[in-house]
């Protein structure tokens, strides 16, 4: 049996009682934190709470050489991830591979950043469109700096439909955790190149350390928000579409947004 367990948003105490019980009953416990991680804890604290050794897996261990998976044929294994399990396609792929090997799988869900963002900002969850991910820029073989324009396109499509866009920010082993500030700078750089008027004057909301005792939620126009200090990671970004009057009021009162938002409601 392979049990996928979502650990929630911030620290070791975000796990559900059902998830904690499954870990304590498992023969072996594995975890990956390259798709998401808990910034308010570490492996030592997790192991102390769980009463179990946790084996940390790399991207290669999960996606390319999951030799450990075969152990689940005759043992109870747990696979831990930040947030809610199965949000990442990597985890869906791993589950399908387990099923093909004849391994039974089980899911134990955890708090998701998608639902947390709605709660923290006051933006209604059914008004979100397709999400986007902003990767760090990279250099081509010729040394040209490449910025992905896919997130810009996704935001554009959602805005045309009046929908909000949840924008995930890159976690890179070498380049580190992308900030809201960097993400907005990259989107504005694409805007400067394409000149389609998507980001200039657009509203934006940044969230830092969701799930902690003192998360930071700040709303403003993108050009202003890029200069706000959100502090330590993890960060996530929202580009709102058309605002319902309750959403606009929430952004002003709960996220310090400008009163001008109240004039832009449906």
From Swiss-Prot:
<dbReference type="InterPro" id="IPR014776">
    <property type="entry name" value="4pyrrole_Mease_sub2"/>
</dbReference>
<keyword id="KW-0949">S-adenosyl-L-methionine</keyword>
<comment type="pathway">
    <text>Protein modification; peptidyl-diphthamide biosynthesis.</text>
</comment>
<dbReference type="GO" id="GO:0032259">
    <property type="term" value="P:methylation"/>
</dbReference>
<dbReference type="GO" id="GO:0017183">
    <property type="term" value="P:protein histidyl modification to diphthamide"/>
</dbReference>
<feature type="binding site">
    <location>
        <position position="84"/>
    </location>
    <ligand>
        <name>S-adenosyl-L-methionine</name>
    </ligand>
</feature>
<dbReference type="InterPro" id="IPR014777">
    <property type="entry name" value="4pyrrole_Mease_sub1"/>
</dbReference>
<comment type="subunit">
    <text>Homodimer.</text>
</comment>
<feature type="binding site">
    <location>
        <position position="210"/>
    </location>
    <ligand>
        <name>S-adenosyl-L-methionine</name>
    </ligand>
</feature>
<feature type="binding site">
    <location>
        <begin position="112"/>
        <end position="113"/>
    </location>
    <ligand>
        <name>S-adenosyl-L-methionine</name>
    </ligand>
</feature>
<dbReference type="InterPro" id="IPR000878">
    <property type="entry name" value="4pyrrol_Mease"/>
</dbReference>
<dbReference type="GO" id="GO:0004164">
    <property type="term" value="F:diphthine synthase activity"/>
</dbReference>
<feature type="binding site">
    <location>
        <position position="235"/>
    </location>
    <ligand>
        <name>S-adenosyl-L-methionine</name>
    </ligand>
</feature>
<protein>
    <recommendedName>
        <fullName>Diphthine synthase</fullName>
        <ecNumber>2.1.1.98</ecNumber>
    </recommendedName>
</protein>
<keyword id="KW-0808">Transferase</keyword>
<dbReference type="Pfam" id="PF00590">
    <property type="entry name" value="TP_methylase"/>
</dbReference>
<dbReference type="InterPro" id="IPR035996">
    <property type="entry name" value="4pyrrol_Methylase_sf"/>
</dbReference>
<feature type="binding site">
    <location>
        <position position="87"/>
    </location>
    <ligand>
        <name>S-adenosyl-L-methionine</name>
    </ligand>
</feature>
<keyword id="KW-0489">Methyltransferase</keyword>
<dbReference type="InterPro" id="IPR004551">
    <property type="entry name" value="Dphthn_synthase"/>
</dbReference>
<comment type="similarity">
    <text>Belongs to the diphthine synthase family.</text>
</comment>
<feature type="binding site">
    <location>
        <position position="169"/>
    </location>
    <ligand>
        <name>S-adenosyl-L-methionine</name>
    </ligand>
</feature>
<comment type="function">
    <text>S-adenosyl-L-methionine-dependent methyltransferase that catalyzes the trimethylation of the amino group of the modified target histidine residue in translation elongation factor 2 (EF-2), to form an intermediate called diphthine. The three successive methylation reactions represent the second step of diphthamide biosynthesis.</text>
</comment>
<feature type="binding site">
    <location>
        <position position="9"/>
    </location>
    <ligand>
        <name>S-adenosyl-L-methionine</name>
    </ligand>
</feature>
């Amino acid at each position: 049996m392979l049990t996928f367990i979502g650990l929630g948003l911030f620290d070791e105490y975000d796990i559900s009682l059902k998830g904690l019980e499954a870990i304590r009953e498992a023969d072996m416990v594995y975890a990956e934190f390259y798709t998401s991680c808990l910034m308010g804890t570490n492996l030592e604290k997790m192991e102390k709470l769980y009463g179990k050794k946790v084996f940390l897996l790399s991207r290669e261990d999960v996606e390319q050489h999951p030799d450990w998976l075969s152990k689940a044929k005759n043992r109870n294994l747990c696979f831990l991830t930040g947030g809610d399990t199965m949000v990442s396609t990597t985890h869906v792929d791993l589950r399908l591979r387990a099923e093909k090997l004849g391994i039974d799988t089980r899911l134990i869900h955890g708090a998701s950043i998608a639902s947390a963002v709605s709660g923290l900002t006051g933006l209604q969850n059914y008004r979100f469109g397709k999400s986007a991910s902003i990767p760090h820029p990279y250099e081509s073989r010729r040394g040209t700096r490449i910025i992905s324009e896919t997130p810009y396109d996704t935001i554009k499509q959602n805005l045309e439909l009046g929908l909000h866009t949840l924008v995930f920010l890159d976690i890179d082993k070498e380049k580190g955790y992308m900030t809201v500030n960097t993400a907005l700078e990259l989107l504005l750089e694409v805007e400067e190149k394409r000149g389609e008027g998507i980001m200039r004057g657009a509203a934006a909301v940044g969230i830092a350390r969701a799930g902690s005792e003192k998360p930071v939620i700040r709303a403003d126009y993108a050009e202003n928000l890029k200069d706000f200090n959100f502090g330590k990671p993890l960060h996530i970004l929202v580009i709102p579409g058309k605002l319902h009057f309750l959403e606009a009021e929430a952004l002003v009162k709960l996220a310090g947004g400008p009163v001008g938002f109240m004039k832009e409601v449906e």
